[in-house]
């Protein structure tokens, strides 16, 4: 074991393959949650509030996964036990969530939401919690086992597999509709095309996580210490650092990359929340009221297609990211990608043809590709190895917090700034990405 050893491409691939299945689950959630809750009876101005729970749970869970997996050393591995636990919970919830409308929970309960919505909310909370438990270890294992020279490649592979999983998850509903599974249902009931998408996604998630679990051998404590140039437990007993102490000692890149993350993830929260309504009104002449209408549910399928094209664009952009990083370095590649994504968001305002709209979402994919790879490359290169998992867990707050803020203020922005126009929220997302690109100049790379 040498500090500068390289992993083969196959080893790097195995490290992240389970991410393919996890991302299918995440894609199904991202593309269908607004559709599901609108079908259950949510008002468009309420939709963003349903998106508070996923990032909130992520902000709580991922730092805990990072902290405790840093201290987990057993025969199953260090990070891998969390993969299995997260995947098992996610599979169970994916079988329940799309059936929320089948339990005839019609009565209005707390905050004016019917019982089906509350059932869906709690299912969503557990789904996102479990996805977070399963997702975070993949990023940590790259930080644990890959040297600085290969991290860019490792996270690019992860980004590619992530987007491939997204592509599969996004097209499931329209694919099942094409083969004859019903895409409409009685009012308040989720269509079968969506239900079967979640069922198949759950099966693939479990298989992919099992593949990584079986094929990856994590470093033992002695190997890990040698790889990262740390003292072993035999050499030194270190006090477990507190949350506050870790934040105080965080490298400046933690905060500057986090600022860029704030604008980026707020933008994508708006995309996930409002794409269904925006596309339905912009391209399918939806009346803005009847969510059981064919126009709304057809638009719901097309959202999946748009997100799939975004994933394809992201995969293609991920392939050229190493070249961009070579000529413009990490920061330049990051900023360029965000600007391309911003143009994609803003262009949706002028598009009324559903097929032309695909070009806009392909451009948006450039920003997504950069968001999945560059921040983690910059951050992990600035960290020492002893609290890598905890810092990556804390860094997840820069993903979750902006989504929470965007979810809380999204309804007000829709009402008072965008005058009820959901397509206006996509333009707002483009403006946020431009602010993110400008903020890239504040990042200083390298270890503290």
Question: At which residue positions do the language-model features occur?
Answer:
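Intracellular juxtamembrane helix-capping segments at the cytosolic ends
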Residues: 133-146, 370-384
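C-terminal ends and interior cores of transmembrane alpha-helices
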Residues: 84-113, 340-352
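C-terminal transmembrane helical hairpin of 12-TM major facilitator-type secondary transporters
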Residues: 325-375
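Loop-to-transmembrane helix entry/capping segments in MFS-fold secondary transporters
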Residues: 44-45, 148-158, 300, 383-395
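Intracellular loop-helix junctions on the cytosolic face of multi-pass helical membrane proteins
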Residues: 1-10, 106-107, 111-123, 133-134, ...
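Helix-to-loop junctions at the C-terminal end of transmembrane segments
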Residues: 60-76, 316-329, 414
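Helix-loop boundary and gating motifs at the non-cytosolic
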Residues: 2-57, 256, 260, 264-289
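A late C-terminal transmembrane helix in Major Facilitator Superfamily
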Residues: 386-416
